[in-house]
Regions:
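A short, N-terminal amphipathic alpha-helix
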Residues: 35-52
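Acidic donor-binding segment of Leloir-type glycosyltransferases
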Residues: 50-77
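Short phosphate-binding loop-to-helix
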Residues: 67-103
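Conserved donor-nucleotide/metal-binding helix-loop-beta segment in metal-dependent transferases, i.e.
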Residues: 113-140
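Short aromatic-hydrophobic micro-motifs that form the base-stacking/packing surface
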Residues: 105-107
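N-terminal nucleotide-binding beta1-loop-alpha1 segment
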Residues: 1-22
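Conserved alpha/beta core of the MobA/IspD/sugar-nucleotide pyrophosphorylase nucleotidyltransferase superfamily
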Residues: 168-231
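Short, glycine-/small-residue-rich phosphate/pyrophosphate-handling segment
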Residues: 149-171
Length: 231
């Protein structure tokens, strides 16, 4: 077991066609495809090289019977949970992992731009004696990265209560004594404006550092299919 742990968690089911939330004007299949390749891109980034942390990949319980072969690889530590009840996930299902690892980082599966190098920077920020939090937020203030070096039920109560909204979380935790590192402008793909930004980001050469050629080709399929939305 490593001192550090990473948890990739989607906001909802995205593989079950009966309940998946369609992404903007995308078809159900393309909505599933977008969410899948965002998630699989993170898996590829974290498992391609020598592991330096324990990884826990979470899917919604309703996706259990719809997982594709890419999620079935032997090296993927897959867990299923009722994502409509994050409080149970944080306070019960992963309590043992949270308390047995020194540093923990929770990532939204909708995030782009994170690789092993970035993760190492995050863990270095958490690797201090004082209790601290690491929060990465989008321009809209949605929390997509949440790291901590000391488990606190009060902190997670605030995280769930805030619905992962940064300002609401700060208001809830103002009486708690944690130092907070804040990362601004992380990119979460939640709507069509973010999809446009994704297109711009992946058009840059530096994107190869966190998105392989294989993954680029998968995203390109969607960019071509929905080119009218990119205007």
């Amino acid at each position: 077991m490593f001192n550090n742990a990473v948890y990739i968690i989607p906001s909802a089911s995205f593989l079950n066609p009966e309940i998946v939330n369609t992404f903007e004007n995308f078809s159900i299949e393309d909505s599933k495809f977008l969410k899948s390749i965002l998630y699989l891109n993170l898996i590829e980034n974290f498992l391609a090289d020598e592991k330096k942390a324990d990884y826990f990949f979470v899917l919604d319980e309703f996706d259990r019977n719809f997982i594709t072969d890419e999620f079935k690889a032997d090296n993927i530590n897959l867990h299923f949970a009722d994502l409509t009840k994050p409080k149970l996930l944080f306070e019960n299902q992963f309590l043992k992992e949270f308390t047995s690892h020194k540093n923990n980082i929770i990532l939204s599966s909708d995030i782009i731009g994170i690789n092993q190098t970035e993760l190492n920077k995050y863990f270095n920020l958490l690797n201090i004696d004082d209790e601290c939090l690491l929060i990465g937020k989008s321009r809209e203030g949605t929390i997509g990265v949440f790291g901590f070096n000391s488990y606190s039920m009060d902190i997670f109560n605030c995280l769930v209560k805030s619905d992962f909204i940064y300002n609401n979380f700060l208001s809830c935790t103002k009486t708690l004594n944690h130092f907070i590192h804040t990362l601004n402008d992380i990119l979460l793909i939640k709507n069509i404006e973010h999809f446009k930004q994704l297109y711009i980001e992946l058009s840059q050469k530096k994107s190869m550092e966190y998105c392989s050629q294989k993954m680029h080709e998968k995203f390109t399929h969607l960019f071509i299919e929905y080119k009218e939305l990119l205007k």
